[in-house]
Structures are given as structure tokens and as C-alpha cells.
A protein has these predicted regions:
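Repeated loop/turn-to-beta-strand initiation elements of outer-membrane beta-barrel proteins
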Residues: 14-16, 68-73, 103-105, 142-148
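Surface-exposed strand-loop-strand hairpins of Gram-negative outer-membrane beta-barrel proteins
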Residues: 26-56, 122
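Structural signature of outer-membrane beta-barrel domains
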Residues: 23-25, 82-84, 114-118, 151-155
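Solvent-exposed loop/turn segments connecting transmembrane beta-strands
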Residues: 51-56, 79-91, 101, 121-127, ...
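Cleavable N-terminal export/targeting peptides
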Residues: 1-12
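Transmembrane beta-barrel domains of outer membrane proteins
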Residues: 62-66, 94-98, 135-139, 147, ...
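Outer-membrane beta-barrel "beta-signal"
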Residues: 17-18, 25, 164-171
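Gram-negative (and chloroplast) outer-membrane scaffold detector with strong preference
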Residues: 57-115
Length: 171
């Protein structure tokens, strides 16, 4: 039976997390005309709308600091890059929730804010983006974690548009 064991950061050391996965796997976004000579449906030389809702491969590096706030929250910094030249650097807070007596099953909710640079894919409507989500890990006896993270990235209505993007990352 799965039972909640302890809330709070168990490890006293900082932790590096690396992973890879899919950026914008739900293919949110929109199509936009990028024809400077007229509309996309112009009879002479018109172009089709350009889609900004493709998914791509994402690479992730995060560092979780050992210092805790309120004995629960751990600050962390991270960086994502995609194979379509989109980049996102962020800072946020996480909390490790341990399950089972072995403390080997961990759920880590996270919340972060950062700076996003659009690449050749989804346009998120603003440079400032917020990321919410979490990780589900199995922690081995040597403290190595293996898991998956699911996240939503959004500008929270700060920009002209707010299509948002989702990420699934194996860590």
C-alpha cells in the first residue's frame, strides 16, 4: 500500500538533474501569416500561414540547492533548450514529498519563473514565462533518482497571446 511518509527535503546536499523529452507535446499554438507583401490569401504571391504549434525535442538541466526555506521549499535553477532553437532559463521552488518507509518513491511539485526565447517553433507571446508541474521519481539506495517530469509553461496573460506549452521529460 502506498502511504505518505514525510514532507520536506530529506537530502542535505544539492542535486543536479539532467533529462530529455518532448516540448509542446499537446501541440498548442497558432498559425500566423508572415507575408510582408499582403495577406496570406493574396492572389499574387500569397503564402500559406506559418504554423507555430510543432512539438520538438527538449533537453533539461536543473540544479536543486541544499538550502531550504520554511523547512520544505528548495530553490532551484534550470535551463531548457530545444532542437528548434527555443531556450528557457528559470528559477523556482520545489518540495520533495517522500512515500513508503524506504523513502524511495518521491513526488516533487515545482513552480518557476524565467526568460523564454522563441525559436523556430511555438511562439509563447512574451519573454517572461511561468512553469508549473512536477516530477515523479524512484530513488535508488545510492540516492540516484530516475523519473519523469510533466510541466506547463505559460506567460499567465502577460503577452498578446498565451498559447502555453507542455513538456514531458525523462530525468
Amino acid at each position: 500500500m502506498l502511504s505518505f511518509y514525510k514532507i520536506g527535503a530529506f537530502e542535505k546536499k544539492g542535486r543536479l538533474s539532467v533529462g530529455g523529452g518532448i516540448h509542446n507535446y499537446m501541440e498548442n499554438g497558432f498559425e500566423r501569416c508572415e507575408n510582408p507583401k499582403g495577406g496570406c490569401n493574396a492572389p499574387s504571391g500569397g503564402t500559406a500561414p506559418v504554423s507555430y504549434k510543432d512539438s520538438s525535442t527538449v533537453y533539461s538541466v536543473e540544479y536543486f540547492f541544499s538550502k531550504r526555506l520554511i523547512n520544505i521549499l528548495k530553490p532551484f535553477v534550470g535551463f531548457n533548450g530545444t532542437d528548434k532553437d527555443a531556450y528557457y532559463g528559470y528559477f523556482g521552488f520545489s518540495a520533495d514529498l517522500y512515500f513508503l518507509n524506504c523513502k524511495c518513491f518521491i513526488i516533487t511539485p515545482t513552480l518557476a519563473a524565467g526568460w523564454y526565447i522563441d525559436g523556430d517553433e511555438i511562439k509563447l507571446g512574451n519573454r517572461v514565462q511561468f512553469r508549473s508541474g512536477g516530477d515523479i521519481y524512484y530513488r535508488f539506495k545510492n540516492n540516484v533518482r530516475l523519473g519523469v517530469g510533466l510541466y506547463h509553461i505559460s506567460n499567465a496573460g502577460l503577452g498578446d497571446s498565451n498559447p502555453g506549452a507542455e513538456q514531458a521529460i525523462l530525468k
